């Protein structure tokens, strides 16, 4: 069951490039909405168009997901009263610039999908080049889309693969084999939090830990903000599953070739973040030095 209010706004198909994702699973049962809020504030530079939070209580009714999302900045969309209503010890958050689909309330994330096997929450940073093809395939088999974003295509494919998979993480892996493009995903089921990165590692995704809570984040700066320790980056092509039993890793989708987005280091990421072991600020200084050496000017 999902608590959402949708407001129709004018469509805007301008292409932009950034999004930020953040997820938490607190094994001590503490509510995570406020933590996600502060994580999203730290990732606000990655998306200022819309934002959202979805949570689930692992000790409550299975499959119940509470979500709230709106246009605008994080501190404008969420009041203390909003956060107080989002009760749950597992959750995902998202800040968005549209890469595919219009700038509307419906296209805000996280997406929450109810299907025959239960409920999924999904936050996605990236862009699929084969989204139109995958969308048509789903529509021909009866899928009805509520948004125009490729993130919903991913969610539908995960749900479909789940019908023939033993676990949600297996379904994520099977869906990834069909996806072409860039994606860093956080998938929430009622008892699991899953992070996945495309085989080329185009956009960042990292893991953090604070006491008995585990985190996924687009950037390490958000982990610092909530007092979490950086554990490691999610490897390109890796699926990381967090459950009360621990962390499981599947690298069967890993590729020998990485193709990271250079603009993460040049422009997108916050200077105090580390991406794949490289300090963003240091990378910018180094790039400037090399540029000056290769193209000196008289000044």
Give names to the regions the model predicted.
Residues 1-236, 241-299:
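Conserved short alpha-helical segments that host acidic/polar catalytic motifs at enzyme active sites
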């Amino acid at each position: 069951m999902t608590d959402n209010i949708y407001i129709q706004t004018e469509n805007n198909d301008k292409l932009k490039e950034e999004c930020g994702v953040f997820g938490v699973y607190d094994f001590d049962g503490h509510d995570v909405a406020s933590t996600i809020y502060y994580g999203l504030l730290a990732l606000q530079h990655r998306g200022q168009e819309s934002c959202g939070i979805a949570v689930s209580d692992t000790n409550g009714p299975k499959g119940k997901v509470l979500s709230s999302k709106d246009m605008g900045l994080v501190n404008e969309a969420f009041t203390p009263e909003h956060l107080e209503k989002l009760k749950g010890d597992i959750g995902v958050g998202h800040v968005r610039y549209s890469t595919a689909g219009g700038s509307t309330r419906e296209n805000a994330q996280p997406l929450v999908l109810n299907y025959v096997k239960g409920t999924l929450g999904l936050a996605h940073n990236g862009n699929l080049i084969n989204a139109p093809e995958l969308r048509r395939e789903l529509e021909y088999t009866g899928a009805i889309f509520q948004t125009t974003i490729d993130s919903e295509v991913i969610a539908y494919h995960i749900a479909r693969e789940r019908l023939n998979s033993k676990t949600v993480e297996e379904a994520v892996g099977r869906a990834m084999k069909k996806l072409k493009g860039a994606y860093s995903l956080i998938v929430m089921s009622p008892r699991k939090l899953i992070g996945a990165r495309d085989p080329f590692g185009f956009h960042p995704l990292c893991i953090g830990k604070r006491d008995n809570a585990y985190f996924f984040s687009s950037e390490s700066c958000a982990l610092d903000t909530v007092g979490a320790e950086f554990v490691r980056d999610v490897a390109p092509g890796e699926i990381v599953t967090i459950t009360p039993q621990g962390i499981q890793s599947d690298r069967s989708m890993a590729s020998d070739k990485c193709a990271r987005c250079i603009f993460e280091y040049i422009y997108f990421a916050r200077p105090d973040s580390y991406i794949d072991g490289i300090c963003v600020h240091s990378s910018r200084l180094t790039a400037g030095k090399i540029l000056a050496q290769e193209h000196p000017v008289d000044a």
